[in-house]
Design a protein with these regions (language model features):
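Switch I (effector-binding) loop of TRAFAC-class P-loop GTPase G-domains
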Residues: 17-44
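Conserved active-site aspartate in kinases
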Residues: 50
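Inter-motif core of Ras-like GTPase G domains
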Residues: 63-91, 103-115
């Protein structure tokens, strides 16, 4: 889930259904205020949940705490959860809220995909370095997961993200 605008990067880029209007987006981080569910197939079997991005949002600490409770309750109730995508700004990865979600994945043995967004803001070597650091962290924590660089503006990483999501959704 997002700390870096999941709505714009995943849903409106729409890597699975190719529907450009799947989610409304905002230029301001933290506009997602509730859990939004998007059905991505005709059989109504596969869904993506867009969770409030409390790690990067300009909201009060109280609101951040409320979102953290909402997200934790939601994730704990999802029997059919196939994996968790955490989108982070590659220049500011692993905020406290990111680490909380990563710990949750570790505790629940949930597959994890870390999308290091805005990779167009770094050099290729900088992107590789950040992706390697994230993958090393996942390995040290014995997590089922991987990290990848991503840029919605340059379309970098779209194929890898699409491939991973399709595997999770068995499509």
């Amino acid at each position: 889930r997002s700390h870096c605008d999941w709505s714009s990067d995943v849903c409106s880029s729409d890597l699975i259904t190719r529907n450009k209007k799947l989610a409304k987006t905002s230029k301001t981080p933290g506009r997602t205020r509730a859990i939004n569910i998007f059905t991505i197939d005709d059989q109504n079997l596969n869904r993506i949940a867009d969770l409030p991005g409390y790690g990067f949002a300009r909201v009060s600490k109280q609101t951040q705490r409320e979102w953290a409770k909402l997200i934790t309750a939601y994730l704990n109730s999802r029997q059919s959860l196939r994996g968790l995508v955490i989108i982070m700004d590659i220049r500011h990865p692993f905020k406290e809220s990111d680490l909380t979600l990563i710990d949750w994945c570790s505790e629940t043995n949930t597959p994890l995909l870390i999308v290091l967004n805005k990779s167009d803001k770094l050099s290729k070597s900088g992107v590789l370095r950040e992706v390697e650091k994230a993958n090393l962290m996942l390995k040290q924590m014995n997590l089922k997961g991987q990290a990848l660089g991503f840029s919605s503006t340059k379309t970098t990483g779209i194929e890898k993200l699409d491939e991973k999501l399709k595997r999770w959704f068995d499509v």
